Amino acid sequence: MEEGMEAPKFKVIIVGGSIAGLTLAHSLSQANIDHVVLEKRASIAPQEGAFIGVWPNGAQILDQLGLYHSLEKLTAPLSRMHLSFPDGYSFSSLLPKTIHEIFKYPIVSLDRQKVLEILFQNYPNKEKIITNQRVSEVRLLGDSASVVTEDGSVFQGDLIVGADGVHSRIRSEMWRLADELHPGMITPQERQTLTVEYACVFGISRAIPGLRSGEHINHYGDKFCVITFHGKDGRVFWFIIQKLDRVYTYPNAPRYSPNDAAELCDKIQDVIIWRDITVGDLWKTKLVSSMTALEEGLFETWSLNRIVILGDSVHKMTPNIGQGANTAIEDVAVLASLINRVVHADALHKPSESCIETMLQKYKTLRYERAKSTYERSRFGARFHTRDNWLKALVGRYVFQYVGGLIENRTSKTLAGGNVIDFLPRPHRLETGCVTRLPKGQGRPQQQWTLLWVSSLVLFLFLPWLRSYLPSATFW
C-alpha cells in the first residue's frame, strides 16, 4: 500500500434490526468495525405484545456492552416461582433467587419493545440503522457481497449477517445461492427442519391483585401451559402455549388472528393458575396481546461464502425456558469476537474470502453444540409443561417438587459456559462470580437423580391406581 493511502475498511451488513442484530451492531461499534443495519419495518421498536426474559448468560454480554444497567432498572428481579396443576395442587420454589446468587445476575422480564428502544437509543451511530429496507436479493461478488432491497438500494460489504428471525430472507437467499454454487448442499431434510406443534398467545397485562412483582407462575395444564412473569409496578408478562392437533412443517403452519387468541383464552378462562387467579384475569387486564405459531428447529447450514445467519434464523425454540433471545445474544458474542480477530489481524489488508469462510466455520463449531443443547432443553420444556404424555404428567405432578437440586442443576448447566465477547472487559459484578462455569459443588445431584428414577418407577407400577386421581385422560 502506498504511503498516505487509507487501508480498506471491512464492512458488515446486518440484516434485521432485531435484538441480535442491534447487539451485533453495538459489538462491532466497540471494535471499530464498519457496519450497517437494515430493518424491513418502518420502526425499530414496534409494540407487538411480545416480551423477553434476560437470563444471566445474556445479561453478562449486555453488561459488557454497557447496556444492562438500562434494562435492569426497568425490571423487578425474579426471586420466587409458583407451580400449579389441574387438580389444584401447587408448590413454590426459590430457584430464581438461587440462580441470581450463583450467577450474579437476576432473571428479568420486560417488553421486547423496551429492549429494542434501549439498544437503539444507546447506539452511537444511528445513521447506520436504516429502516424500510426489505431485502429482495443477495449477491456474491467474489471479493465482496451485496444486498439489494425492494426500493432498489444496493448495500455492498464484506460479510452479510442474517439476524432477521425465523422467516429469514437471508437464509432463503443463502439456500438459493447454495443451490446454484453447490447443488445438493441444502438437503430436503434441512428444508423441512422447522416444525410447528404448538401455538402461543403472548400478552402483557396491568397489575393484578395477588400477583407480586418479582414472582413467576408456571401452570401445567393438559396439552397447554400458562406462564407468567410479574415485573416492575406489577406489570404482568404472560404466555399460553397450546398443543396443536397435528405437526406442521414450515412454512405450512397455521396463522392466527386476534379472534383466535380471544377464542383460546375464553375456552380456558376459568382455569385457576395460582390461588384464585384465573386465565380470565390475565385476559381482562391485558394491555396488548398476539397469537402466533411456535416454530422449532435447529439448522445444519449456518453459513455460505460471505453469508452467515444467527439467532432465530438458525435455531428456533419455544419460549418455555426463556433462552431464545439469550442464545441469539451468545451467537453475537462469538461472531463479533471472531470478526474482530480476523479484521484486526492485518491492518493493511482485508481478510480474504477463504479467511472469512474459515472464520464462519469456526463460528458454527464454537456455537453448535451449546445451541443444540439449549434447543433440546427448550423442546423438552414445552412438552413437559404441557404434559403431553402420561410420564411427563406424573413426574411433574408427583416428583418434580422433591428434586429441586436436580432442576437447579439442569438450569445451571443451561446457563453455565455462556459465551462472552473476548475483546471487551469482563463485567465488574463477575469479579466475585462467573457465568462461564458452575460453582464448585454444582452439577452433581446424584441422590436426586436416583430419587427421580426410583419415583418414576414406583409411579409406573402404580399407574392404574393413579389414573383415577388425575384430572384428564386425554393423554393416556
Curated annotation (Swiss-Prot):
Cofactor dependence: FAD
Membrane topology annotation: Single-pass membrane protein
Compartments it resides in: Membrane
One term of GO molecular function: FAD binding
Transmembrane listed as a keyword: yes
Documented EC number(s): 1.-.-.-
Biochemical pathway: Secondary metabolite biosynthesis; terpenoid biosynthesis
SUPFAM superfamilies referenced in this protein's UniProt entry, alphabetically: FAD/NAD(P)-binding domain (SSF51905)
Residues that, per the record, bind FAD: 39, 53, 112, 312, 325
Active site: 220
Disruption phenotype: Drastically reduces the production of andrastin A.
CC terms in the record's Gene Ontology section: membrane
Enzyme class: oxidoreductase
GO terms (BP aspect): terpenoid biosynthetic process
Alphabetized Pfam families for the sequence: FAD_binding_3
Keyword terms, alphabetized: FAD, Flavoprotein, Glycoprotein, Membrane, Monooxygenase, Oxidoreductase, Transmembrane, Transmembrane helix
Function: FAD-dependent monooxygenase; part of the gene cluster that mediates the biosynthesis of andrastins, meroterpenoid compounds that exhibit inhibitory activity against ras farnesyltransferase, suggesting that they could be promising leads for antitumor agents. The first step of the pathway is the synthesis of 3,5-dimethylorsellinic acid (DMOA) by the polyketide synthase adrD via condensation of one acetyl-CoA starter unit with 3 malonyl-CoA units and 2 methylations. DMAO is then converted to farnesyl-DMAO by the prenyltransferase adrG.
Stated family: Belongs to the paxM FAD-dependent monooxygenase family.
The protein's name: FAD-dependent monooxygenase adrH
Originating organism: Penicillium roqueforti
Gene, per the UniProt record: adrH
